[in-house]
């Protein structure tokens, strides 16, 4: 012993070493290289050294500290000494207060099994591996573990005599088979160790024979025919050894016989062909407080098998299994008996640990004297018989099930006396690369008590005492842990949480739980089946499924508590939401069980008396409510204690509340199917995913002469029920700004274009006689081709808009059917914005065609005035309302046609002496086709273009005055006079330009806008044409103009008569126009107009250059006119203003809102429909969204919707990922091996290279190279299926497609060709 504070030394095979400072050592192991440091772990004040070797892993409780040093780690072996380091108290307190790691040693050889030597004073372990069988001792004072002897490692001298191992002798290692299990004997045979493995023999070693001259092998038992998986010594009759292996036989050997037969067992039990994974004697620990005594436990043993069976036997009747239980759905891998009660816990590949009661129901076993198996009468004990499979009841249910989600490798009860079996602890280890040793309390099956993390997956462990566990891992390290010093998992878990359930759940879950512990409340629990009603303990630390295990479901005397807390629970106002799901516990939805044998229905007798049905058939839901609802009846009101788990189905609750409040309002009878659909959020999602339109095919849009009309239901909502509902809810479309658009005659683009060809300005018949020059004709021919291409593009855009409008209206109808008004209005907003775009696009197309027909064909100018087209009137009214600055229609826009004189009266110009040449108006107007939205500046441009056309018409209509030639001097004088008058008029008018006319009286220029309406209008030709009265600006437009431009409200009323598309001087009543007018009144000297001819020339030159309105006229000799400058400034303001109904702006905002609110369907619909048009997000985001949405559709089994989405997906990398080829591995029907057929493929390829071109026809996957057999033949023709084949699901028989087609269709058969009794069709 060492004193505190004194120097410590370490003894080793090489001597003693002084204490070393903290440092890192380079240590080699069989699997990796790592750095390790050893130091005191700090339990109390006792100095000791330790600890296990850990890699810096997130699973281990050790990690690198802030200084870069490794946590408490060491690497010890038999040949290497270990330096010790004891940290100071202060440094230790900063690092860790306690942990449970006590011992650690790196063995350096492969190990696979461990057991303790059943001699308390020896403190030894036996560890076995493929080439290692060693005895290890540990010291609790020094906290060290040492290898004492390796029975498989010896040294030979020259004389051939084997001596103890020495460093001077050459070492040899004896190898045995892979060890499956190692066990040590008890009492008189405590020096015996049995090992078994992949060989067919069990080797018995005497651990006391450690000298070289002694042979430690006592005997070798080899009656098994296949590898042995498990061996075990009997604790009472210590000479009895039991073994079980892959041959399905259980062998019992008696080691007391003086001449042991190594090839014949004393008892042999044949369980058939079912392999045995584990076999154990029932333990007989001598606990001081055990009142039952040893009784007859030593006669009992049990085994688990590959089929999942658990069998219990009695040695006195080995030909009959006392218990036969279907314990697991897959192979059962391990079992262990409770230390003193009739319980067995089993583990399997299905990841479940199941607790089974295997005691006698009467609890009174006959006192039969012990049967002594000795050599005096060996034949009487050689019982070889097969147990009858039908005699034992296999229908049993576990007392408790712990789900670990990993295949169980080892599990063992803690060897401690527990009055209540549910206070017992079990240690488990699993298969896999991420497996630790987990310690569970049966009172808390969902949360382990301790998780012992090691540097590598565990391969075996053993309980030394109540608190100490020794573990070996795949890094060949043995580690000892004291679980009493280990923190529990519960210490690091939150005690309350709130989570969203998945889409198939209840929406939201509240969980509040007190910390609790790992012990059950009840101190005593009677043995199941004792005939007495057991107490039914229920602790807040346990789930309802765990509570079920206390109630003894197999006891028919258990009565159900009819006044259960479940009824009061449903009436509790705070928990009343559970009533939303009648038949479910706490509102949790029912689930289906996959395996009938895994059900937790040991309360089945009490279920019948329950008014609720049991939706659960399996306890294997890692949830507090995973048990049967009958548990609510079997317990008292303590069920309402912690943990509280409340599930709320928010959509269902809100829909119920809303439907209740709107019941009187709706007053309509809905179908049961619709009501059921609305009550389930999942079904609503599926319904919307199926019904909503997410895309449209661009290929379907073709240019046709007759066009395609928009569905009337998508434009004016002809359904009366929908209209009435909208009006009741205040959602009527009569107040929308597209209301007037919807009731036009047609939205077809072709019709609109034809109507847009109508001219609105009266001209004389002489316009048809205009002669065109050859140069202008050639230029206009090229312009006609460009115009045709642009018109074709506009037609495609128009039909795309019509398609999108139809889809928006369709989606809106889907939402209105579900009474989802918010999403309904969203789709209406998008539809209306697209209708506005459609109107603007068709207007621009109409203007283009108007200009073409004006220039090319003047003969049809009289026809439009014979019609009164509403759409043309709307177009005309819209351009007239540009003066208001408010983009909406008013009721006065639809004015009737009356007989009236021409709106404009122009003085006859005397200086127009010749017919002007045809201008490049068509080319100048091409810029208007590039935009899809007509702003106020665009309307100004169109109006000025029409003014130029009117000036030309006036020149033609006054062609008789052109004969009066005026020489250049007279023209110069007149221009100077006109310039002077224009300047004076510009000062007075500040905005308007009046074209003078030569008259007998004084030259009359229009003095002000107010005089325009009162001035007498003179017709432009002798004939008075009847034309529609120009639309007047409505009161609403005037009112909005005043709101938007308060400074100009006093002149708007006077300018009302001039705000029209046909006006040669359009009015500007906005605040910007007012500001510019006042600015230009100060600089009027720079805004002179010389004559009407120059007005036309200047405007034409501006349009021809196609420059922005911010630029100036290219002519250096001509100053900028007042209108041009005003239009330039107005265009600047218009470029910075986006109307609120802009489809790009509106849809982008709606998309952002849907993303923020988590509306998946709306987000994807907007993204898929409008991404190409408006570029809402980047391409990568679109691809990710489509991929995630497709995965979501697959989760809801909406495969047809996902397939349609992928079919129309424009991104090949997304569509090809789901529609590409998939690799499917085929297996042979006979040998179950993969069908690779590489050998035959090489042979056939070689034949083809040699010249046999038809050799490849023999290759295929209809045969197997491994077993040289053909696969399943056709059930009709009995030939190999080399081509397309189909399978019948009822019976599983397969056949050629053509053969079965002939059988079922041609011969009209309805059964399988092989005569299966089931009718297929």
UniProtKB/Swiss-Prot annotation:
Residue ranges, compositional bias (Low complexity): 23-33, 551-574, 1060-1069
Subcellular location: Vacuole
WD repeat boundaries on the chain: 109-148, 174-215, 223-263, 271-323, 327-366, 403-450, 453-491, 797-837, 1108-1151
Stretches for region Disordered: 1-91, 546-574, 589-611, 893-917, 957-1069
Compositional bias (Acidic residues): 965-976
UniProt cross-references to SUPFAM superfamilies, sorted A to Z: WD40 repeat-like
Superkingdom of source: Eukaryota
SMART domains: WD40 (SM00320)
GO MF entry, a single one: zinc ion binding
GO biological process: positive regulation of macroautophagy; positive regulation of TORC1 signaling
Keyword terms, alphabetized: Metal-binding, Repeat, Vacuole, WD repeat, Zinc, Zinc-finger
Keyword Zinc-finger on entry: yes
Composition-biased stretches (Polar residues): 7-18, 593-611, 898-917, 1010-1022, 1035-1051
Any Gene Ontology CC annotation: GATOR2 complex
UniProt xrefs under Gene3D superfamilies: YVTN repeat-like/Quinoprotein amine dehydrogenase
Annotated zinc fingers (RING-type), start-end: 1274-1316
Keyword Metal-binding found: yes
Residue ranges, compositional bias (Basic and acidic residues): 81-91
Function comment: May be involved in a process influencing telomere capping.
Assigned protein family: Belongs to the WD repeat RTC1 family.
Protein's name according to its UniProt entry: Restriction of telomere capping protein 1
Organism: Kluyveromyces lactis (strain ATCC 8585 / CBS 2359 / DSM 70799 / NBRC 1267 / NRRL Y-1140 / WM37)
Gene that specifies this protein: RTC1
